[in-house]
Amino acid sequence: MRNTSRVAILVVIVGALLALTNGFWEGKLLGLFSVLMSCSVIFIALVISLENRKPAQTIAWLAVLGSFPIVGFLFYLLFGRNYWQQRRYKKKADFDEAVLLKFQEPSPIAVERLPMAPHQRPLLRLAYRIGQHPVSLASQTAVLTNGEETFSSIFAELEKAEHHIHLEYYIVRHDEIGQQLKRVLMEKARQGVRVRFLYDAVGSWKLSNAYIEELRAAGVEMIPFSPVRLPFLSNQINFRNHRKIIVIDGGVGFVGGLNIGDEYLGKNKYFGFWRDTHLLIRGEAVRTLQLIFLQDWYYMTGERLLTPDYLSPPLIVEEGQGGVQLIAGGPDQKWEVIKQLYFAMITSAKRSIWVASPYFVPDEDILTALKVAALSGIDVRLLAPKRPDKKIVFYASRSYFPELLEAGVKIYEYEKGFLHSKVIVVDGELASIGTANMDMRSFHLNFEVNAFLYYTDSIHKLVRDFLEDFRHASMIDYEQFQQRPFRVRIAESVSRLLSPLL
């Protein structure tokens, strides 16, 4: 980084001299601006190159800066400055490590009791080593399909809370379902239940101050995650908390794809029916979900809640058929945890890989793994939305379809409504449900959390849900897909060029 600073100083000095000379001889403000902008672009290009980013990211940034200097310069100020990311999150990482050493089991001994094939066990070792959370055999899970089932279950469990409620969400809206949640939380707070609520400051930027203040007045602790006050001077806008977590009394937890908003109940006229998946967890694994929340709470408030009140011995339930493991991923971690576990799941497959992702923007590793699996004769299926909510991501996703189709991947476009489910099922034996999409933002930038399931009954429910979803989807034909208009191909190509930045 010192070399980068020296280069930066040199570029600025040279740029200033050129700018002054240009301004003196031509006397044109435009010339001064042009030279300064050129120097700024050169400086950013040097910084990006010296950071040793992934080649695709480096090339994408250089292409944007070269083609659209002013737009690229502003875009970089907003989204590209990752060089001090590790320093920002060092305090959180140190605290997280201390918490894990103190409160997690030293080794996943119980895993040996799982009825897993030898080729699947490396996945468990990887998950424990880079995810640092153990597999629980004393937990029960229930798949919640879509909004009505999810919110019914959430409100039923919230009503039972006696000691504490912890919530962490990316999007919270003050619409009908948001108001219902507010009323329940206010009532529980008045009953003496401690309610803590982390909401992402960017994802929930439309949330009204009145909504927040009403909750605070009732005793709910409302904390925004990484508020952004000066967007162009801080790239905090780029690292968002995409997690959806609820923990009730330390024994019941929820995680999955649904935020708090009426659209998740199918009340948005554009999207209509909203297809999503959430997971209810009871028992030992909830302790991991609690730890993830407490680590994020400490990061934003400095408050340590590592007491028996919140981390008492977990609620013991009857040992289930399989294992449950909660894994957190984020820019504060050394490893690309979610991506590496997705990769390991894909490469462990012997029969089938079924993926549902609303935003499919894979990096080269995941893309290659899917193609190799399909070429090897494995039943690889991708379920994606037919109706976009983010057009640039939609077009970027479709740019990957031709090579996947050529490799033998079956691609289904969901037609009943909008697909927002983030699920992977491998061989009908392993699965992941959570907040992470199969895209670069979830892999590298966002704070995410997924539940990895091993030989649980819930996996059978996920398989049934997939089969039902395929009934409401159309399978893309390669020859027909190649007939799409030239303007669409251009949109896909440009979007794909930007995909490392998305």
Curated annotation (Swiss-Prot):
Gene Ontology terms: cellular component: plasma membrane
Pfam families: PLDc_2, PLDc_N
PROSITE patterns xrefs: PLD
Source superkingdom: Bacteria
Residue ranges occupied by any PLD phosphodiesterase domain in the UniProt entry: 237-264, 415-442
GO terms, biological process: cardiolipin biosynthetic process
Species of provenance: Geobacillus kaustophilus (strain HTA426)
Active site: H242, K244, D249, H420, K422, D427
Keyword flag Repeat: yes
Name recorded for this polypeptide: Cardiolipin synthase
GO molecular function annotation: cardiolipin synthase activity
HAMAP family the UniProt entry points to: Cardiolipin_synth_Cls
SUPFAM superfamilies membership: Phospholipase D/nuclease
Gene3D superfamilies: Endonuclease Chain A (3.30.870.10)
Compartment(s) where it occurs, according to its Swiss-Prot or TrEMBL record: Cell membrane
Entry coiled-coil feature ranges: none
